[in-house]
């Protein structure tokens, strides 16, 4: 089936799909204080979703394109779940978040199909994949339209990889007690086996969201990147997130000696947000297999254990946490009790001496990850490094931080 036909088959106009903001039915929803963070964007009034401009632009989306799609959503007069929230249009139709972003992605997909130049076509496919992922954001369990957008994002990503520099391999890893998981191995030009970074992404992102990280930072240094979806989303959707948050990544890490393109003696892990929970767990549990662990805006203790901090976090992010934990009908109190068990300090790991070199980068006044969080990680390591990232100018400082982190990883892998 062609890509265009697949899009048409998946996205027939329907109006009975459950609207995204209603999928998690938590009680005690409160008012949302204004909030902004570099990695998560900000909660803009009258939007259910956090508008994550920095990360979307970093992935290659033009700021004007973001505004154009937002304008189409705002201007829609279709029925909404909540009249006060623009992005709650019911059904797959004009004004619906998934519809408008998927429509934008299909335009780029069409351009990719018509483009004769392989490199340019690859760029268009990659852009389509990014837009499909934004359509599916925040990737809540049971969101049928979002799952269809994810399928198209993965297909577009595979098309892009065939045309862009280096090579990409889709790999399947067995996990005892359940379904296998699919990972993408991104390899730079040259002969392997390559030093490799195991990417541990945030809970509201897909593994295909990190191509920019590979292309701009790892590939120029001859480092491969292995990505894997977090439990309960994408290719890992059959796995629920548990207190053993690193389970899937741990099995992949153990299997790397059998992957001929990876130098399993030179592997590091890099965790964004909750992905740092996975990466730091691996630093303790799999120290002999890891040369280094880097974290950015880590969520390993404070947000998971402090009710006051949780009360400042936007509803969408709490919905993401509840969705990943399979707690779609939970009260905030029940969610807090469960989240506390995910704290690596409560689990008895963080605070103990760890032989793995660990770096952690933080922004001051980050609502998701205070400075103490990163300091706890780096002081627990026998070779720790702490990086404070100035907020403004946000894009340039984000790039500088990633360059510094990549150099640190490279130094420990090579």
From Swiss-Prot:
| Protein name, per record | Esterase FrsA
- NCBIfam families, per this entry? PRK05077.1 (NF003460)
GO molecular function of the protein, one example?
carboxylesterase activity
Q: Which UniProt keywords apply?
A: Hydrolase, Serine esterase
Q: Which InterPro entries match?
A: AB_hydrolase_fold (IPR029058), FrsA (IPR043423), FrsA-like (IPR010520), FrsA_esterase (IPR050261)
- Similarity comment text for this entry: Belongs to the FrsA family.
**Catalytic reaction list:** a carboxylic ester + H2O = an alcohol + a carboxylate + H(+)
EC numbers listed for it are 3.1.1.1
Spell out the Gene3D superfamilies in the cross-references. Answer: alpha/beta hydrolase
Species this protein is from: Salmonella schwarzengrund (strain CVM19633)
Function per UniProt: Catalyzes the hydrolysis of esters.
